[in-house]
Amino acid sequence: MPKIGVSLIVLIMLIIFLAGCNKNEQNGDETKMQSLVGYVVLKDNERAILITDTKAPGKEDYNLSEGQLMNKFKNNIVIVGLSEIDNTDDLKRGEKIKVWFHTRKESNPPSATIQKYELL
C-alpha cells in the first residue's frame, strides 16, 4: 500500500510539473510596444523614412534622395514598414508622427514594422 501511495504522489507531481512547463502564455497585443517620434521625409506604399531628430528637417531635406538622407541623418533615421497599417493616406511627407512597434531591427539604418501611428 505505501508503494502505491508514494507512486501516486510522484505521478501527480510529475503531471503538475509537465502541465506547468507546457503553459503557453498568449500575450498578443498585451506585449508592451515601443514608440518613437519623427518626421516623414519619404513615403511609398510599403514604407516610410522617419527622421527622429528633435527639430524638423529643413525644406531642402525633403528633396534629398534616400541615400543622401541616410548620409546626412546617419544616427537619426528609421525605416518604418507600413504593411500592418490599413490606411496611410493621411501619412504625408513633412508630418510629425508618433509610431508604435513591437521590435526594431538593429540594421543600418534601423527598421521596424509599425502597428499604429498618430499625427502630432
Curated annotation (Swiss-Prot):
Keyword annotations: Signal
Keyword Zinc-finger found: no
Key word Transport present: no
Domain of life: Bacteria
Endpoints of the signal sequence: 1-27
Gene3D superfamilies from the UniProt entry: Nucleic acid-binding proteins
InterPro entries assigned to the protein according to its UniProt record, in alphabetical order: DUF3221, NA-bd_OB-fold
Name of this protein: Uncharacterized protein YobA
Organism name: Bacillus subtilis (strain 168)
Name of encoding gene: yobA
